[in-house]
Every structure is written in C-alpha cells, then in structure tokens.
Swiss-Prot record:
The gene is dxs. Pathway: Metabolic intermediate biosynthesis; 1-deoxy-D-xylulose 5-phosphate biosynthesis; 1-deoxy-D-xylulose 5-phosphate from D-glyceraldehyde 3-phosphate and pyruvate: step 1/1. Its cofactor is Mg(2+); thiamine diphosphate. It comes from Maricaulis maris (strain MCS10). Thiamine diphosphate binds at H79, A120, H121, A122, G152, S153, N180, Y287, E369. This is 1-deoxy-D-xylulose-5-phosphate synthase. Pfam families: DXP_synthase_N, Transket_pyr, Transketolase_C. Binds 1 Mg(2+) ion per subunit. CDD domains: TPP_DXS, TPP_PYR_DXS_TK_like. SMART domains: Transket_pyr. Transmembrane segments: none annotated. Belongs to the transketolase family. DXPS subfamily. The keyword Metal-binding applies.
Length: 643
C-alpha cells in the first residue's frame, strides 16, 4: 500500500541549485519530504531502504553546501543514494528504481552528471575521490572533492590504503565517515555530555584498568597524561585518522542540520589538506519499522508503508542459499573441523543459519574478501575444513589471494560461490558472470556448478571430502526446483557428469541451472523430429572428457550451455575437443554463454531471455547448427510458448 506523500518544498526542487538559498527551517522540512518520498518510492519498487533513510539529512546538507556537480560527490557502495537521486533531477523516475530500463539502484556514471563515479561494491570511494582530487590539482582547478563512506566499508583494507596515500599526498580531500552502526563512537551534542556517558562505559573502565597497570611503572603525573591521551584517542576515534595525515572533525549528529550545515561550510572554506568528518547516523531513520529492525530493512521487497509488511511471495521450494547452509550444517555435525567464513554477508550466504548452530565455527570477517580468502587458507593449512561462502561478484575482490595463498599452495579451501550467473534487479555490478573463467584457469582447482538443490547438496558433501587442493561450487540466487533431497547424501565422483536424457542427433551439454531450460529445449526439438541428448556436466574442471568425447562422437551437433561469460566452460570444452582431434571430422559445435556485455537490471528470467539462454534460444541454436531455416526455429519457439 502506497500513499503518495505531500511534498510542497520538494516539488520546487529540480536540481541541487534549488537548495542553495533555503533557510535552515525549510531545509529541515525538505529533508522530511525527501525521507517520505524515499519510503514511498521503495515501497513500490523494493530496494535498499535503511541506508538511504540514514543519510537524508546528510544528503540534503551536502547538496545545500557544496556546488554539485562542479564539486565532486562520490558515494561509497551507492545503495544509500536514493535521496541523492531525488535531489539531482531524477525524482520523476524514482519509482523506476531497479526496474527494466529504469534508474539503477546504485550510482551510475551514464545515468547523471551528479554521479561522477559508479559504485555497488564497497570501499572504493576514497581511492576514486583521491584520483579526482589529484586530477583537479594537476589541472589547477578550484573545486571540492567529497567521498562519503560507511563504517562498514572501513573494514576493507582498500579504504585505509587510500587514506594512507591521501595523507602522503596531502592535497585537499574531504572524507565523510557515515558511522551508522555506532562502531566508533556515539553522537554528541556537547563534550560534557559525551564524557559523562564515556566514563560510565565498559570501554572507559577497561582503559582505566589499563591505566592503573601503567601507573605502576611510570611516575603518577606522566602515567595520568599518557592514559588520558590514550583514552581520548581510542574513544574519539580521531587518532588513527590523524596519524594517517587527516584532520579529524567530529563525531557529529548526522540527523541534525543545525550541526551538519555549519561544519560542512567550515570544512568547505577551510585550509588545504585531507579532512575526515565523522558523522553518526541511524539506519532506517524516520521510519519506525526500519528503525526497529535495520537488518530486515536493509534490502526490502515491495512493502506496505503503513504496516511495514513486505510483499514476499511464498516460495514453493527452498532457496539454493538455504540448501547450502543446511547441508553445511550436516557436514559440520559430522566433522568438527568444518568451519564457515563470510565477508560481511552472513544472511545473504546462509552462514547466519550455520552460525546459530555453530557460533564458535562461523567467522564473519567484515567487508574484507582478500582477508577472508587468506584467513580460510590459514585455517586449511592448520588442518581445518573452511568453507568460504562469498558472492561470485565479491570473490573477484580476493582473486590474487585465491591464486597466491590457496591454489599455488594446494590448500583445501572450499569456495561456496553464491549468486552465480545473473541476479536480476541489482544489475551488472552484482552479476556472477566471471568465476568459471577465472577459477577454471587455476591448476588444481575443482570447479562444480549445481543444476538443482540435490546436486548442490552433493557438491557440498564432495567439497568436504576434498583434502588435497582447492574446490569451488557455484549456485544461483533464488529458489530451487523443488526436487526432494534425501537424508543421506552421496558425494560426486570428481570430474564425472551425467546423462539426463538420451537422444541421437543433437547433444546439449549444460553446466549449472540451465539444465531445466535445456530439457525444455530438448522436448521441443524432439517434437519436431530431432532426437536430443541432454547431459549435466557438473564439473567445469576437471572436465568429464569421456562423456564429452562420446557426445561429440555420437551426435551431429553439440551445444554447450552455461551461466557464465565467454572464456568459460564452453571454451574449456572446445579446447579439449580440439586437443583430442574431435573437431577434425566436422562436428558442428556451438557454445552458449552470457553475452559479451554488462547487462542492466531486469527480472532474472528476462535477463536470461535478453542473454539468449532460455529454452527457445538453445533450441534455435541447435537448429541453426543443423542447417534448418528460421521457420523451424519459429515452430519450436511457438511450441515452447504454448507449452
């Protein structure tokens, strides 16, 4: 249920220029209207809600004080950018967020001049902003560069690498630390209030205890001075940033425009050099359901604004993520060496369920994929059985560690690659397109792709038994097929696929969940008189050479199908067939992959339709290879639609 809010001030805002002369009282009212508009828009489209609501006042203040787009404003991750989009001329399209042909759910350079740098992954903003700042100085220009980064993103080493470099360069750069988890310090109105709360805190008492120990070794006066400096630095959060060459300002209340606006003006008009402003905010601010449960309202489906109830359809089958978690729990019950590692995505990867059962064996390392991989490598080297559950798109961030710390040392880290393939509304930045190619290139890697929930369970079991090197299994976002999973799961034979359907003229070799579409294509082809074999490869590495050579030998046409980019499974098959001389007799072979483009957001089925990987495309490709005309393909397509 959505009731369009009344927004008289926002109705007059077409660009940030319209905010410049607003007095503070009207600026506060504008922020309230932006918050109401954000809530209403996301209730219609779904998307990231809590983070955006937490930065409404900050966004309003930034566009009031700074001269965007002349001043460069970069949002880390970008999922909090909905208020920013509303204020930068995109309000008329805000209810197309994450829809086909609509606004991206993140910042996007091609969408607006107010998005100077795109994002969707964490911790990139300071590096990018420093690049803009250095470019500005080399061109002798006079403009501000601002990066807004959340405290969660500060858990990634890249943010500190950028700050270290920025402090060394010493140029003018403004970094705003949006502390929405209160992980560094609480908001303050006055220092006296702050220290009143501080001295009653466990943190202060721990530091005071430490101070007593120090006093035994130092003169009382010197000990007191050093303890005070240490306490203030730890509590206020500024010492680390100042040591890196930043002037530290804060913490300040990120929802109080009376504080935000003058501080931003002072920093804007202040001295050169890097500055960090520590702003404390609350996720979901101003919307009671989101304030009460910020984790459930981080990313939401369409919802009723009045009740907060999300409109989630009841699943007919469990999600692949849940199936993975349940099987991992079974493995951990049988083997105390099984542990789970995730990089700030316990809920998304299912490791929250594992952690409920085994709290001492689940490790959330924060937004730190590089560390996650090498941490898992260390666990493996010490005899544990780590499962690193990471989204395909985020595993890219730790690829050097996969190569250097895992593969070269032949350490048995098991990579559970969630969100493999196309993911829908989050678009290109979150697609799991490349892992088959970049993992399949590594010597000794065992790489599997699940066709359904039972196959995924068997792959978890198989990975748990691999102790002589790394392994990985990939599976998509969303629900499974509904296949029954028995209590006793049998492992797979390494490098062996399976024949799912026997035929004689055309062979379709599927890797992953395109198996269902491949079977539909085979039915349609058979109805037109083309007997079709369907095989599930299971393994992208090592390949089942015997199976593939048999398919090549006994059929006129061989089609490979995968939910991955060019240079993946199909390329591996072609390389093997060429090496074995199987192409010499004139086999007609085609590889169906994701297209060589970055696809924008659509519903998952529609994304695969655009990609040409649904049943009608598979059948059409087979008919093309058989030399049949378009009319035959049209008949098959019509049969599939009718079916």
């Amino acid at each position: 249920m959505s009731m369009t809010p009344k927004t008289p001030i926002l109705d007059t805002v077409n660009s940030p220029a319209d905010l410049k002369n607003l007095p503070l009282d009207r600026l506060k009212s504008l922020a309230d209207e932006v918050r109401a508009e954000t809530i209403d828009a996301v209730s219609v489209t779904g998307g990231h809600l809590g983070a955006g609501l937490g930065v409404v006042e900050l966004t309003t203040a930034l566009h009031h004080v700074f001269d965007t787009p002349t001043d460069t404003l970069i949002w880390d991750v970008g999922h909090q950018c909905y208020p920013h989009k509303i204020l930068t001329g995109r309000r008329d399209r805000i209810r197309t967020l994450r829809q086909p042909g609509g606004l991206s759910g993140f910042t996007k350079r091609s969408e607006s001049e107010y998005d100077p740098f795109g994002a969707a992954h964490a911790s990139t903003s300071i590096s990018a902003a420093l690049g803009f700042a250095v470019g500005r100085d080399l061109k002798d220009e006079n403009r501000n560069v601002i990066a807004v980064i959340g405290d969660g993103s500060m858990s990634a080493g890249m943010a500190y690498e950028a700050m270290n470099n920025a402090g060394h360069i010493g140029g003018r750069l403004i970094v705003i630390l949006n502390d929405n988890d209160m992980s560094i310090a609480p908001p303050v109105g006055a220092m006296s209030h702050y220290f009143a709360r501080l001295v009653s805190s466990q943190r202060y008492r721990s530091i005071r205890k430490l101070g007593k120990g120090v006093a035994k070794a130092l003169r009382v006066e010197e000990a007191a001075r050093r303890a005070e400096e240490y306490m203030r630095g730890m509590a206020m959060g500024g010492t680390l940033f100042e040591e890196m060459g930043f002037r530290y300002v804060g913490p300040i209340d990120g929802h109080d425009l009376d504080q935000l606006v003058p501080v931003l003006r002072n920093v804007r008009d202040g001295d050169n050099g890097p500055v960090l402003i520590h702003v404390v905010t609350q996720k979901g601010k101003g919307y009671a359901p989101a304030e009460a449960s910020d984790d459930k309202y981080h990313g939401v489906a369409k919802f009723n604004v009045i009740t907060g109830e999300q409109q989630k359809s009841k699943a007919a089958a469990p999600s692949y993520t849940k199936v993975f978690a349940q099987q991992l729990i079974r493995e951990a019950e049988a083997d105390s060496r099984v542990v789970g590692v995730t990089a700030a995505m316990p809920g998304g990867t299912g490791l929250d369920l594992f952690g409920e059962r085994f709290p001492d064996r689940m490790f959330d390392v924060g937004i730190a994929e590089q560390h996650a991989v090498t941490f898992a490598a260390g666990l493996a080297a010490d005899g544990m059985k780590p499962f690193a559950a990471i989204y395909s798109t985020f595993l890219q961030r730790g690829y050097d560690q996969v190569v250097h710390d895992v593969a070269i040392q032949k350490l048995p880290v098991r990579f559970a690659i969630d969100r493999a393939g196309l993911v829908g509304a989050d678009g290109a930045t979150h697609a799991g397109s490349f892992d088959i190619g970049y993992l399949g290139a590594l010597p000794g890697m065992v790489l599997m792709a699940a066709a359904d929930e039972l196959e995924l369970s068997r792959m978890v079991k198989t990975a748990a038994l691999i102790d002589d090197g790394p392994s990985a299994f990939r599976y998509p976002r969303g629900n499974g097929t509904g296949i029954e999973i028995p209590d006793q799961i049998e492992p797979l034979e390494i490098g062996k696929g399976r024949i799912v359907r026997e035929g004689s003229r055309i062979a379709i070799l599927s890797l992953g969940t395109r198996l269902e579409e491949s079977l539909k294509a085979a039915d349609a082809l058979a109805a037109q008189g083309f007997s079709t074999t369907v095989a599930d490869a299971r393994f992208a590495k090592p390949l089942d050479e015997d199976l593939i050579l048999r398919l090549a030998r006994e059929h006129e046409v061989l089609i490979t199908v995968e939910e991955g980019a060019v240079g993946g499974f199909g390329a591996f098959v072609l390389h093997m067939l060429a090496d074995k001389g199987a192409l010499d007799r004139g086999l007609r072979i085609r590889t169906l992959t994701l297209p060589d483009v970055f696809q924008d957001q659509e519903a998952p089925f529609d994304m695969y339709e655009t990609a040409g990987l649904n049943a009608r495309h598979i059948a059409a490709k087979a008919l093309e290879a058989m030399g049949k005309d378009d009319a035959a393909a049209e008949r098959v397509a019509a049969a599939l639609i009718a079916g």
